Amino acid sequence: MRFLWFGKKKNKTVTEPRREPVEVFSVDNFVLVTHPLGNAAGTALSSEVICSCIFSVIVHEESVASKAVQDFLQERGAMPLASSEYTHSSSQGYAARVKHQDRDKSSTVLIGPPAVISKASVPFHPEISAAIAASQEIFIVAIDGITYAAFTISSEMQ
């Protein structure tokens, strides 16, 4: 015996596979000082040069967080510069020699926690000191022993 059904057929529902949450990184509290020592000769750098120096050091790191920093800096005009002698330590931070387009020599670029960078640089500019006071999980950028920038990296699950 056969069963005949003349009613409506059920629509097949397609369920999408559940998406796993992804950790998304972003740069926050970015402080950039182009004249950290006031009118002292030879210490002023353009924001593009500062961002390019940071980018040229961070580009050696292959993590999702560093990719977020690279994207952030490229939005601000950063371009890759020639770099050498790259080093990274989880406790000390990043370091490399970077050759600017507007200088004949290369500069030492340090990126790391305030306690480490303060030992290798002149006293921090007040804007950078204020950023440090606002967040202890901050990266400080020093170029040839002068602090030019500070930033934090935050993450959220999406």
Task: Pin down the residues of each PLM region.
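Cytosolic catalytic regions of ATP/NTP-dependent phosphoryl-transfer enzymes
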Residues: 13-122, 136-147
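Generic N-terminal initiation segments characterized by hydrophobic and/or small/turn-forming residues
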Residues: 1-3, 29, 34, 154
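Divalent-cation
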Residues: 127
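Polybasic, Ser/Thr-rich amphipathic helices
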Residues: 1-11
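Short, acidic loop-to-helix structural element flanking the phosphoryl-transfer center
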Residues: 151-158
